[in-house]
Amino acid sequence: MKVAYLSSAYLAPVEYYSKLLNYDKIFIEQHDHYMKQTYRNRSTIAGPEGELALSIPTVKPKEPKCPMKDIRISDHGNWRHLHWNAIESAYNSTPFFEYYKDDFRPFYEKKYEFLTDFNEELCRLVCELIDIQPAIERTKEYKTDFAPNEIDFREAIHPKKDFHRTDPEFIPQPYYQVFEARHGFLPNLSIIDLLFNMGPESLLILQKTCADSQ
């Protein structure tokens, strides 16, 4: 049985969902120390001007090393409104935005207290829309020793790291993108880029992203 360990992630990239599809068991880390500038609170979409990072503000923890499970979402800067406007602006001309938008909009209207809960519920929705059924559990403690069948992707899947180097089993697959004529194909964006552009065919693309499927 193949087991993957992942960090919590906000509208995670295609690489992340490739693991959800291709591993038999997924553990989402709850006890790692929270770090900004990671997919824990950041997602990358494609707009008219190219890649655009969306970051969720968080409440500064009292302790310098705060477990991810205790990180609270801040209401600073009207971020929900800004994120939804950015998503709408980037994807309202895609083939499937109108079809899926009412599934996503409520996440930007409801206030969630904890970042992990917000990320988890969004992930559950995306899995349902793509039609994958990963076996996911939250970790009960921070794991440092891994069996041969367990792979640690908690820091490997990172917006500042080159997936070609850190994750050779991930093979990005080109698909239709609205702004491709301007910027060329942009690989490994947020899963919503794939979903809004490809709709039900997202699963077919995702199935090809694992080296084992080549």
Predicted feature locations:
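Residues lining hydrophobic/aromatic ligand-binding pockets adjacent to catalytic sites
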Residues: M1-Q214
